[in-house]
Amino acid sequence: MSKIVVVGANHAGTACINTMLDNFGNENEIVVFDQNSNISFLGCGMALWIGEQIDGAEGLFYSDKEKLEAKGAKVYMNSPVLSIDYDAKVVTAEVEGKEHKESYEKLIFATGSTPILPPIEGVEIVKGNREFKATLENVQFVKLYQNAEEVINKLSDKSQHLDRIAVVGGGYIGVELAEAFERLGKEVVLVDIVDTVLNGYYDKDFTQMMAKNLEDHNIRLALGQTVKAIEGDGKVERLITDKESFDVDMVILAVGFRPNTALADGKIELFRNGAFLVDKKQETSIPGVYAVGDCATVYDNARKDTSYIALASNAVRTGIVGAYNACGHELEGIGVQGSNGISIYGLHMVSTGLTLEKAKAAGYNATETGFNDLQKPEFMKHDNHEVAIKIVFDKDSREILGAQMVSHDIAISMGIHMFSLAIQEHVTIDKLALTDLFFLPHFNKPYNYITMAALTAEK
């Protein structure tokens, strides 16, 4: 029987552990260490919880220590790993305040990522704290269950008068939180160093639609501004950028995450951003040591190269692949396209692959084709919304590199999966134009926006 130690029980770790226990539990001894007090919190639901769009946090957990141990794992919670001797194959962790050593034959990192702390005057992390607490009161990070719970508890305390909130970071998390706070009746300003929201996921003509959507719902946008300082006497009073000052009661820092790979200790090869560099089996530069989820690289099929794309969906898939290989059952990942989506005030946006800007930066002779139309025929009077689509492709190979869609019709969310597969399988824009897509008025048009975008593509 092989002994496998897993460091981290986040999404990737939980997927990995469950895969091993469900498929190869009789063949392996599974030992898990996690520095947190809970397992499997769905951070993607954090904004829904804060914005009171769901009843509570209970549904945001799908596993726990008891469930994993019932399947046969040994799980140590609140137990940070302090060091790893890769030659002796021994993990040293802090368990109940004491040093604990655990040998292994295979090791899997699922250490995830940590919030980026931008160089802002007046903001520091409390030293020795594992829950990302800031030294200035009401400066909040958003990563863990505890972070969301703290924000909710503070907002529920009416004596604090937390009515004005600044969200720093215009990515998915920042935009979702801005909506959540506005839904609570707060005065919200969204600040980002770039001049648009959702930068990197969509081209600017699409991001402008979301920007207008936010402004239409009373969220102030302070884009193209660099945060210089957060000031206050013990607690937040104002946020200072290079262009203006905002009187605020709370600041949410949501500027992104970096891979948590401190345990590499100079012994494991890292990617340019510090992530564990892994192959398609999720194996690192040390044989028998694997890394899954946000702490590891992925193979980007659109770029045809190694990349870093931190998404829960990627975490689950890489966790499954890592589990199979750590258990001695060879399985290669097929790469990713970075498929993603967001829904804000009923405006749904989905994308996969590369934006036009990113495709050109990656060296492609890229161009785009697009189309705007109703989802269904004009005679369908109810629930018939406009859809905008953009397809990015390479003019030389004609291969599809990316796609973006936006609509108030949530049906577009399923269409992006087809484009994800198209990128994975190197489908050309010309083949897409003749792909068999069904027609029924309840769903779409005979010449639907996908077909029309492909048919009108530059030859």
UniProtKB/Swiss-Prot annotation:
InterPro entries: FAD-bd_OxRdtase (IPR050260), FAD/NAD-bd_sf (IPR036188), FAD/NAD-binding_dom (IPR023753), FAD/NAD-linked_Rdtase_dimer_sf (IPR016156), Pyr_nucl-diS_OxRdtase_dimer (IPR004099). GO terms for molecular function: oxidoreductase activity. FAD binds at residues 10, 12, 34-35, 44, 81, 110, 113, 143, 172, 294, 311-313, 439. Shows antigenicity in humans and elicits protective immune response in a mouse model, thereby suggesting may be a future vaccine candidate. NAD(+) binds at residues 173, 192, 201, 256, 310, 341. The keyword Secreted applies. Binds 1 FAD per subunit. It holds the Pfam family Pyr_redox_dim. It is found in: Secreted, Cell wall. GO terms for cellular component: extracellular region. SUPFAM superfamilies: FAD/NAD(P)-binding domain (SSF51905), FAD/NAD-linked reductases, dimerisation (C-terminal) domain (SSF55424). Keywords: Cell wall, FAD, Flavoprotein, NAD, Oxidation, Oxidoreductase, Redox-active center, Secreted. Its cofactor is FAD. Its main location: secreted. The modification Cysteine sulfinic acid (-SO2H) is found at residue 44. Its EC number is 1.6.3.4. The active site is at 11 (proton acceptor), 44 (redox-active). Belongs to the class-III pyridine nucleotide-disulfide oxidoreductase family. Catalyzes the four-electron reduction of molecular oxygen to water. Plays a role in redox balance maintenance. May be involved in mediating bacterial adhesion to host cells. May be considered a potential virulence factor. NCBIfam families: NOXase_Strep. This is NADH oxidase. It comes from Streptococcus pneumoniae (strain ATCC BAA-255 / R6).
